[in-house]
């Protein structure tokens, strides 16, 4: 079962997110997600197996330029995670579908995402669910 997350879901959402982004703390994620959930142009979806939360997806609208698109806003998959024992069963595809449906209700005609160059599993997922590679970039930073 997939459902849109609410404020009451922050603790479980943050725990799942820390599996995807292990450099973050649950408390930090709760705070960040509370701010994001309050915005009308962002949404989280949770996947359940019976009563157990097994995955989540974070999506939002991007109004700035999104590589490979020519419309605005663009729905954007910011993150997606499914617990190990539930992968390869279509859960991530269902989460993505919920995000895409949400983006359509917000007036989007395009949906985008990204992944790190060395994340082969994520790249394969994106290709398997219909994304097309738009570009590869290298990001730079510089201390001032």
Language-model segment annotations:
Residues 96, 103-115:
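Conserved GNAT acetyl-CoA-binding A-motif
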Residues 14-28, 65:
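Helix-loop element at the rim of GNAT/NAT acetyltransferase active sites that forms part
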Residues 70-84, 138-139:
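Conserved acetyl-CoA binding element of GNAT-fold acetyltransferases
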Residues 93, 105, 117-136:
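Conserved active-site alpha-helix within GNAT-family acetyltransferase domains
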